[in-house]
Amino acid sequence: MKEVIDTVGRRKTSVARVFMTPGKGRVIINKLPVEEYFKDEVRRSKALRPLALTERTEEFDIKVNVQGGGITGQSGAVSLGIARALTEFDETVRPILKTEKLLTRDPRMVERKKFGRKKARKRFQFSKR
């Protein structure tokens, strides 16, 4: 078995590199504890959901470098990275994570703005007269 498992998770424009080692359950994101980095409980629970579902919150030390996007995209990227690392460590957790759709890269991206319009789909106000 490898000592360090490293995986990549992506969501929107965020990229998270996850390094997982056997340990005591510490999660460090960009050199900050997860409680400090994701102050919002919703984003924190989203990021750590794979660990909670597989009941392995105390088994691994996880270091994450995450860049790009906002906090929602980053928490999704971290979640995917952790899920991939867990399956690389132990294939038996794959069905659990797969049923919860945690191993699927969310393909949704921001639609580009089109010329002649205010935003991607919104048009300028139309006046008949």
Curated annotation (Swiss-Prot):
InterPro entries for the chain: Ribosomal_Su5_D2-typ_SF, Ribosomal_uS9, Ribosomal_uS9_bac/plastid, Ribosomal_uS9_CS, Ribsml_uS5_D2-typ_fold_subgr
Keyword Ribonucleoprotein listed: yes
GO BP annotations listed: translation
GO CC term (a single one): cytoplasm
Key words, A-Z: Ribonucleoprotein, Ribosomal protein
GO MF assignments: RNA binding; structural constituent of ribosome
Cited Gene3D superfamilies: 3.30.230.10
Family: Belongs to the universal ribosomal protein uS9 family.
Protein name: Small ribosomal subunit protein uS9
Species: Chlorobium limicola (strain DSM 245 / NBRC 103803 / 6330)
